[in-house]
């Protein structure tokens, strides 16, 4: 399978630590259902404008990100790889795609799986949207230009999500982490799934979320 990314040479991006203000505490199941229903509504109507196809492409990408607990660029790169390999994939089985893990200095790839609700015909409908995104990167000549184009694309996706849903892309990643933590998945396994290098961070995050839920839901004797 052909693997594409903006940069497949040795990673050199610096790792930035997040302060935690990005985490909006969104619910995984509610968000998944919301994206899925909005996607279906779009598919059921007559698509007249280019923005309709872009909206479908964006919703597919965010469903993809949410389902895998990945970073937004990993989801975008994953969708591009699916688009360019669409006819070489076995759509009778669950589709997985490899992408380069972002924010890592080591040479690390991860597998992402397409949500069951996303079908081949959905990708075919918006394939050109993802190929155009790929072209935005490929037409740049230097690595600095490619990096700037990548950041611009990520910003565009993030702005669209915030404008339409009031949430940020990183919250989708941690909604999945929280969801798996609620199902008793150990921090070590969570780190492997989401490609977090810092297991202690995952432990602290999931324990903090659990502590908030316990404080909120356990102790009242008024009912």
Curated annotation (Swiss-Prot):
Domain Tyr recombinase, first and last residues per copy: 29-220
One GO term (biological process): chromosome segregation
Gene3D superfamilies the record matches: Intergrase catalytic core
Pfam families from the UniProt entry: Phage_integrase
Keywords: DNA recombination
InterPro entries per the UniProt record, alphabetical: DNA_brk_join_enz, Integrase-like_cat_sf, Integrase_catalytic
Catalytic residues (UniProt): 71, 103, 170, 173, 196, 205 (o-(3'-phospho-dna)-tyrosine intermediate)
Disulphide bridges: none
GO molecular function list: DNA binding; site-specific recombinase activity
Similarity comment: family membership: Belongs to the 'phage' integrase family.
Protein name as it appears in the record: Uncharacterized protein MJ0770
Source organism of the structure: Methanocaldococcus jannaschii (strain ATCC 43067 / DSM 2661 / JAL-1 / JCM 10045 / NBRC 100440) (Methanococcus jannaschii)
Lineage: Archaea, Methanobacteriati, Methanobacteriota, Methanomada group, Methanococci
